[in-house]
């Protein structure tokens, strides 16, 4: 389960390491849980590029994911594990005993036929979701809320997990995948276990075209541009004769861009390490 290395039959397969999709049990999404997804090619509502290197790619349907896990006390059976083109993780289709269907991010170790539940009285096992105050110290969690009821915002990518380190009054101390130590309010929900598909980091697309299928466009070096397009542009030869900067003139290579005096500073015990 995870990835497979292709034989070097062509240039495009020579270095390719791709998913084997062994964990997938259902190929078509649940119709009631998908909606159209409009492409924006990295543009905002003014038509300006706010995210570079985006555009094209295969047409997608958006899968509606339950990040809130707010259906408490009702067991749900894992009906299928599916591919989701909108994220690196897989998703699990749940059939609740009252007839409702929902998608969640697939945690490592959750199998078709398993039963899971959400709520403060749920058992501590993979796939169950509880408030942080009810989860023992040392437990690995994912899909962590920052505001109660808003839905999980942290630790949602393939293979990721955070660890609960301790409690301080109304807050729980968590180590995030980046290495950051942070306090999160104890009433926020989190799901037990690590996100599945840890092999995602081994993926090698193998050719430019596979990036284009994903909607990723080429990244052009600043030194290959004209002076009007980038601070590194122009000049004779390959030197740009200054400290490296971003396209907007901010120093790059280690320069901190997080603005000072942010509200969340008081919740960050230790900043992320390299």
UniProtKB/Swiss-Prot annotation:
> What GO molecular function annotation could you give as one example from this UniProt entry?
transferase activity
PANTHER family membership: LARGE RIBOSOMAL SUBUNIT PROTEIN UL2M, RIBOSOMAL PROTEIN L2
Q: Which SMART domains match?
A: Ribosomal_L2 (SM01383), Ribosomal_L2_C (SM01382)
GO terms in the biological process aspect are: cytoplasmic translation
Q: What does this protein do?
A: One of the primary rRNA binding proteins. Required for association of the 30S and 50S subunits to form the 70S ribosome, for tRNA binding and peptide bond formation. It has been suggested to have peptidyltransferase activity; this is somewhat controversial. Makes several contacts with the 16S rRNA in the 70S ribosome.
What cellular component terms from Gene Ontology apply here?
Answer: large ribosomal subunit
The molecule here is called Large ribosomal subunit protein uL2
Which UniProt keywords are present, listed alphabetically?
Answer: Ribonucleoprotein, Ribosomal protein, RNA-binding, rRNA-binding
Q: Which organism is it from?
A: Sulfurihydrogenibium sp. (strain YO3AOP1)
UniProt-annotated stretches for the region Disordered? 221-254
């Amino acid at each position: 389960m995870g990835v497979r290395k292709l034989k070097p039959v062509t240039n495009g397969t020579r270095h390719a390491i791709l998913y084997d999709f062994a964990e997938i049990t259902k190929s078509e999404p649940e119709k009631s849980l998908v909606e159209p997804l409009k492409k924006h090619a990295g543009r905002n509502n003014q038509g300006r590029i706010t995210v570079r290197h985006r555009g094209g790619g295969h047409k997608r349907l958006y899968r509606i994911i339950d990040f809130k896990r707010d259906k408490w006390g009702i067991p749900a059976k894992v009906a299928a594990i599916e591919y989701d083109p909108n994220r690196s993780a897989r998703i699990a289709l749940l059939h609740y005993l009252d007839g409702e269907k929902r998608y969640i991010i697939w945690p490592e170790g959750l199998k078709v036929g398993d039963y899971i539940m959400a709520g403060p009285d749920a058992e501590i096992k993979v796939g169950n979701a509880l408030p942080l105050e009810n989860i023992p110290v040392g437990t690995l969690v994912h899909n962590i809320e920052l505001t109660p009821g808003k839905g999980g915002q942290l630790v949602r990518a393939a293979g990721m997990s955070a660890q609960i380190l301790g409690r301080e009054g109304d807050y729980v101390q968590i180590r995030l995948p980046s290495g950051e130590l942070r306090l999160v309010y104890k009433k926020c929900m989190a799901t037990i276990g690590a996100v599945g598909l840890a092999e995602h980091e081994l993926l090698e697309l193998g050719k430019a075209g596979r990036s284009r299928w994903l909607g990723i466009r080429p990244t052009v070096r600043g030194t290959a541009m004209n002076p009007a397009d980038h601070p590194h542009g122009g000049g004779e030869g390959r030197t740009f004769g200054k400290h490296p900067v971003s396209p907007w003139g901010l120093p790059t290579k280690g320069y901190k861009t997080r603005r000072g005096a942010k509200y969340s500073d008081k919740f960050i015990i230790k900043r992320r390490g390299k």
